[in-house]
């Protein structure tokens, strides 16, 4: 197990201390001794977050909280690279398989359920380890949920009907005109966020970019020890392509067909998830060999684009220390995070 590795070099200690001091200067209150520590492992898809979180949890009596917006859904297993049942036997996992595919789950749900899980784990004397790549969800966990108004079903339904009738690109263009700053943070295919943004602006007469996180740039309650794992783009993209191929070999299309029979298309969030959206579109075609190859191409391309957006998002997150996992051995990465956690 990597956790038995000991790396007591002065260089590792120096790097860890330097990382900690950088964050402490920006957020001195985050390092108050009376605050309980929580490890956060983020990064783009295919960078090794899950393996590292498992290793840390096995070593330090940790429990893992998923920060993946789709792993909450039962049945979305292969396409979300969900922890296996065997892995969940060794280490307790939270916020996995907690919703049926027909149910909704949003950032506010995540905030309250993740905070509840953190406190429960701490009360048991264990270490919460949050792992995932959803920047929006992690931002909410660190600073508090978005301050937008509660959803109004009638208003939301009108926008959902309109986006189905006109297409997401038309409503995305409308959003870009009303709030170009927020529009740049999402894609034209993200129907759920487009609809929610338009709903918020109709209800508040304010731009989402001016509303969502105003006045909440201070970490809440806990001492979050945040890390962003990354690799050089070329190597990351190569790993992404291989993972997509592996998912298909493991039966991803059968998984999507089953979810389709359960009504995934009625879930505007789950049906737009990377891989699932492309697979559902393919299932509506004649499913020829050339159309299948086009599906694979779009699946890989969408995953690479998502990884790029993850880099963009986390560059704006001051609490996260970046670690090039291609530059450092896994043992060194593990030891750095462990020593940082032990640093008071």
Swiss-Prot record:
Swiss-Prot/TrEMBL keywords: ATP-binding, Magnesium, Nucleotide-binding, Transferase, tRNA processing
UniProt xrefs under InterPro entries: Dimethylallyltransferase, IPT, P-loop_NTPase
Gene Ontology molecular function: ATP binding; tRNA dimethylallyltransferase activity
EC number: 2.5.1.75
Reactions that this protein is recorded to catalyse: adenosine(37) in tRNA + dimethylallyl diphosphate = N(6)-dimethylallyladenosine(37) in tRNA + diphosphate
A Gene Ontology BP annotation from the UniProt entry: tRNA modification
Cofactor(s) demanded: Mg(2+)
Region (Interaction with substrate tRNA): 68-71
Pfam families: IPPT
Site (Interaction with substrate tRNA): 134, 156
List of residues binding ATP: 43-50
Binding site for substrate: 45-50
Phosphoprotein found in the keyword field: no
Annotated function: Catalyzes the transfer of a dimethylallyl group onto the adenine at position 37 in tRNAs that read codons beginning with uridine, leading to the formation of N6-(dimethylallyl)adenosine (i(6)A).
Subunit note: Monomer.
Protein family (similarity comment): Belongs to the IPP transferase family.
Protein name: tRNA dimethylallyltransferase
Organism of derivation: Protochlamydia amoebophila (strain UWE25)
Organismal lineage: Bacteria, Pseudomonadati, Chlamydiota, Chlamydiia, Parachlamydiales
Gene: miaA
């Amino acid at each position: 197990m990597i956790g038995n590795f000991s790396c007591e070099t002065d260089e590792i200690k120096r790097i860890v201390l330097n990382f900690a001091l950088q964050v402490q200067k920006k957020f001195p209150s985050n390092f108050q001794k009376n605050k309980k520590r929580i490890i956060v492992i983020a990064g783009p898809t295919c960078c090794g977050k899950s393996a590292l979180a498992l290793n840390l949890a096995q070593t330090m009596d940790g429990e893992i909280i998923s920060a993946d917006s789709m792993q909450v859904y039962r049945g979305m297993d292969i396409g979300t690279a969900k922890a296996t049942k065997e892995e969940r036997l060794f280490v307790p996992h939270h916020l996995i398989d907690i919703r049926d595919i027909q149910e909704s789950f949003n950032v506010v749900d995540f905030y309250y359920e993740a905070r509840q899980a953190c406190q429960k784990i701490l009360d048991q004397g264990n270490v919460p380890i949050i792992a995932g790549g959803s920047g929006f969800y992690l931002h909410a966990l660190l600073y508090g949920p978005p301050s937008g108004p509660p959803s109004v079903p009638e208003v939301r339904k009108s926008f959902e009907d309109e986006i189905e009738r006109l297409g997401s690109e038309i409503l995305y263009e409308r959003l870009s005109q009303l709030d170009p700053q927020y529009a740049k943070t999402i894609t034209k295919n993200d129907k759920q966020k487009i609809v929610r943004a338009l709903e918020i602006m109709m209800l508040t007469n304010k731009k989402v970019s001016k509303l969502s996180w105003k006045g909440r740039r201070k970490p809440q309650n806990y001492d979050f020890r945040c890390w962003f794992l990354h690799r050089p783009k070329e190597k990351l993209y190569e790993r992404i392509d291989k993972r997509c191929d592996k998912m298909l070999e493991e039966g991803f299309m059968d998984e999507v067909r089953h979810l389709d029979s359960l009504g995934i298309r009625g879930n505007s969030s789950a049906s737009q998830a990377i891989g699932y959206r492309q697979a559902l579109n393919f299932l509506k075609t004649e499913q020829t060999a050339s159309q299948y190859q086009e599906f694979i191409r779009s699946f890989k391309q969408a995953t690479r684009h998502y990884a790029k957006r993850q880099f963009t998002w986390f560059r704006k997150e001051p609490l996260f220390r970046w670690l090039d996992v291609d530059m450092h051995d896994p043992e060194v990465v593990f030891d750095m995070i462990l020593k940082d956690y032990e640093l008071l």
